[in-house]
Amino acid sequence: MEYILHIIIMLSIYVILVLSANLPVGMANMLTMCQAAFYGIGAYIGTFFLMQFNLPFIVLALIVMVATGLFSLLVSFASVKLKDDYFILATLGFQMIVYTILYNWTDVTRGPYGIPGIPSIKLFGVLSLSGVWGYAVLAVVLAVVVGLLFYAIKKSPYGRVLRAMRRDEQAVKALGRNTTLFKMETFFLSAAFSGLAGVIYASYVSYIDPTSFTLDESIFIISALFIGGIGNIKGPVLGALFVVLLPELLRFVGLPDAIAANMRQIIYGLALVIIMFVRPQGLLGEKA
């Protein structure tokens, strides 16, 4: 039973991550390659406040989301006016910078040795989450809340502006909308919720190190989004299912761990290529 609950927790975390990526990528046409950087920033900031102050979860989540969102402004100030490949390169550079800092700033992050013994999250400052049941409930509730929030954004006038920007940004500018501000706000929200996923992950596994927040992780998140489908809520959920369940299915094939890890990357790549040729909008496109 604990194994199933573990899968549910990781699935919920990835649902939040892929939904967060869907906001800039699927709605505002901003292909970002730094979701894992924000995921990691949230994990490390959350770890610091958990270990130093043991804050209640609501306070901790707000601090982490605001702090991670502010970090996103560092890259959005410099990159939101860039187009296509140049924007991708800017976010890729930010991803590499964050990973390098996490790996080499050993006085703070302990580098490749990681940070062990991260405390459990406390709800309302009293009830400490212990065991997988508590984390499973929290993770599922947060994934549902984030999904409903992003659905509300999609259906709101704000979401309609974002989708219009994806189709014709110049037309939106001609109507007097500040598209740069919309992009920065979208980037802020995406980073904030990625950071939220990070603090849940850090507290749940009680150990973090930079290898959990590499460029590969960003690629997995974006791959899950494109496989599932961009521009809606169902697509990211399906993509998260694919990313989380595939490694678990490979366990039952009986392959050695080293081969299974390589097979996972090969299958991800093949699935993404096939989807791009057969169904470019993803398995569940925007109208799904």
Where are the language model's segments positioned?
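Transmembrane alpha-helices and adjacent helix-loop boundaries
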Residues: M1-A288
